[in-house]
Amino acid sequence: MILLELQEQLRAEYNPDGSLLRRQQMKMLDILLRVDKFCKEHDIKYWLSSGTLLGAVRHGGFIPWDDDVDIEMMREDYLRFVRLFEDDDDLVLHTHKNDLHYIMPYAKVRDRHSVIEEHSGGENFKYKGIFIDVFALEYTHKFVNHQMHMKLRRIRKFEHRYKRNRMVDAIISLRKEYAFATIKAWRFISNLLPGKQLRHTLGTWCYRKARYEEDLFPLTTVQFEGYTFPAPHDSDAYLRKIYGDYMQLPAEKEVHTLKIEFLG
């Protein structure tokens, strides 16, 4: 972990208590705690991943300028998670199945009492609250994963090209239904090819690095914002394969959120 003095300087600069970013981070932490409780109740194994794990290891919590939370789980657990998770007055599980304009193969658990505007779009999403991302991992081939990603990307580009109306929505619905229906065929093709690796589920291209079971299992724990969460067995190896020298602070601090509104 970085020196406490440096950590305090970064907090003061990027996410001091009471700032919009810190309020967003605390809301994401609330969602993560709810998801953690749910996963424990249903014996669903997950772990902090990507930048969230990096924040835990390097900062003991959120990277001061970070505005998202990522968790990963194996595809079998992901399918159970999506099947068993129940929406309530505070949270909703956002997937391609309950929103025509959500064209991603992974889920978000969203807060119902906030609205965010992101660089990556989402203006047509049915649900727009603060969220955490839930990613599935499966053994697949990089080429097949990329082909599925390009298919979904073309649908998103089509959506952004035309003004919304019933005909455009109908075309999006048909193309999206066809694209997700072909995942089974792509998965079959992938199983025939050599060189499969543990990667994010077909069509997910925001994280292109492979994962390795020896780095992940058996799971251990890590401290994050004063709470204990599941983590990969070898977080150092996991992070180095993704980020290289992850203890080195980046020159540019990437932020995804443009605007936040807290409701009520």
What are the residue ranges of the model-derived segments?
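Active-site nucleotide-donor binding segment shared across nucleotidyl transfer reactions
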Residues: D36-V69, Y78
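A short secondary-structure junction signal
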Residues: F143-H149
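Short, conserved charged micro-motifs
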Residues: L79-R83
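Short hydrophobic/aromatic beta-strand micro-patches
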Residues: E72-M74
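Short, cationic low-complexity segments
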Residues: R153-D169
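Short, solvent-exposed beta-strand-terminating loops
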Residues: M1-L4
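Conserved catalytic core of two-metal-ion nucleotidyltransferases
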Residues: L6-H42, F85-K142, V168-G244, L249-G264
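Aromatic- and glycine-enriched beta-alpha-beta binding-site module
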Residues: Y139, K151-R153
